[in-house]
């Protein structure tokens, strides 16, 4: 009985020490540490690849090719969306499937959008972490863009430079 108790106590101690050792993925933590190292002070938004609605509109007007990646749910797509020529609609819960990652260009700027910017920030961070360096996030989401443009023109194609 004493031997069984000692064995169980030893096994429990070993299990608890292993759990503490594996509390988080140290390799992934190192990757995030490098990724977030430049996120400091007034330039934090730029380091996080955040773009304000007015900056986005100016880039489109100048003729920059920007691929909008809308990560909202299919039900949300019908309310209002991004009227850019190369826009992609991939819900965040489908985004990291191989066939969807293959749709995201690596040679153009990709602007991740959602309603408020929360899901886009998460998706953009994860995409950059796996190697998509050309990914940016629309600060404040489509709601902020609509507020910047105005209700009448928010869902119309943006004028391009001609």
Task: Put a short name on every predicted segment.
Residues 68-70:
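Structural scaffold elements adjacent to functional motifs in cytosolic proteins
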Residues 2-7, 19-62, 75-109, 118-162:
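Rhodanese-like catalytic fold shared by cysteine-dependent sulfurtransferases
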Residues 112-114:
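Short, surface-exposed ligand- or partner-binding patches at beta-edge/loop junctions that are enriched
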Residues 9-17:
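Bacterial N-terminal signal peptides
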């Amino acid at each position: 009985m004493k031997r069984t108790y000692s064995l169980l106590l030893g096994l429990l101690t070993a299990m608890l020490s292993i759990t503490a050792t594996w509390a988080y993925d140290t390799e992934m933590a190192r990757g995030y540490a490098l990724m977030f190292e430049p996120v400091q002070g007034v330039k934090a938004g730029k380091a996080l690849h955040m773009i304000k609605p007015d900056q986005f509109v100016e880039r489109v007007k100048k003729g920059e090719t920007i691929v909008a990646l809308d990560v909202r749910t299919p039900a949300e797509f019908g309310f209002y969306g991004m009227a850019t020529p190369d826009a992609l609609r991939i819900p965040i819960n489908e985004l990291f499937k191989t066939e969807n990652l293959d749709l995201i260009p690596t040679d153009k700027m990709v602007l991740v959008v959602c309603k408020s910017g929360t899901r886009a920030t998460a998706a953009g961070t994860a995409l950059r972490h796996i190697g998509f360096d050309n990914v940016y996030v629309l600060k404040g989401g489509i709601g902020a863009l609509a507020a910047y443009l105005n209700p009448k023109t928010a869902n119309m194609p943006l004028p391009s430079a001609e």
